[in-house]
Amino acid sequence: MAKNASIQWNNSLRLALSDVDETIADVYTPAEPAMIDELASFLDEGHKLFLVTGGSIQRVQNDITNFLPPELRQNILISHCSGAEVWGFMPQGELQPSPFYSVYEENFTDHTKQAWRKIVDQLINEFGLRPHSTQQKIDFWATVGRDPLDIMLDDRGPQITLEVVNGIDLTAEQLKTLPYPVPLTHGKHDLRVAIMDRANELFSANNIPVTPRLGGVFALDLAIQGVSKTTSIKRVLADNQVLATIGLAQGDIKNPQELEVWGDKFSIIHGGTDRHISEAVSPKVRSIDFREENPSEFPKGFNIVIWDGRHRLHHGLLEYLQSRH
């Protein structure tokens, strides 16, 4: 057991449902070698992993699964873009030729896809945003700077994300430079909220089934309406054919102790989307929060515990994984 941690390893665990950003790896950053080693041994021991992320399938591959031995990848499922699609792997380690389901391809015409992106362009112009490619935030600050109007834009197909790296807590001086108001929300002037409110108006007026919502630390996710981490997980856990691709059946994970949720943002007040993973399974399933959050902000009735080892975020999960040895 990890020193100073009161949370012990779950010896009954069969399937872990895990967030990605800041839980397995830092944002837009490959998982560290030690994490890859632990995930590989976790899978080699017969455990299964369901990665649930607002990020794209390409990012999960580039930052995590491509580093894992090919023969172990078939034990992994990936719900990306906040539940818009669920993918798996072939026995040889290649990605399946098509997702197990795709709300995006099933419901969006080419015209709707184009109209969605025109609205994104309109938002960028109205708010005077300067979009840049995605990168580690340290690199972004070094090469681009800290102006709140400089953002990262990530078109993931089934989801478009604006990373408002410098604008989640605007100062009085920064607010004076903007030609539009930014509302005070939970004690902060968060530029994402102003953009989100306008995006809601535009999507509604144009009948585009997209919902803007806060995600991650500084992300504004423009996600398909009605789709969430919860819906994708529930769909998979109810489908024996999908579960069979990772060597499981519904009967294998009936006991709440056979499942576990790993995440880092469960706070309702601060837009924590990892709570949606917990909401997809029995409230008795243990959810481990690897960020220091206020438990009073968690959804009521769920078994959410805060990791109390030496480290937090992805280093906290690494510590937890290492504690089983």
Regions found by a protein language model. Name each.
Residues 5-15, 31-32, 223, 230-325:
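Mg2+-dependent phosphoryl-transfer enzymes with acidic/Ser/Thr/Gly-rich catalytic loops
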Residues 30-151:
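Active-site phosphate-binding/coordination module
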Residues 36-43, 117, 200, 274-278, ...:
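Short amphipathic alpha-helical segments and helix-helix/interface helices
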Residues 60-64, 89, 164, 270-278:
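A short acidic (Asp/Glu
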Residues 135-259, 264-265:
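Conserved acidic, metal-coordinating active-site core of Asp-based
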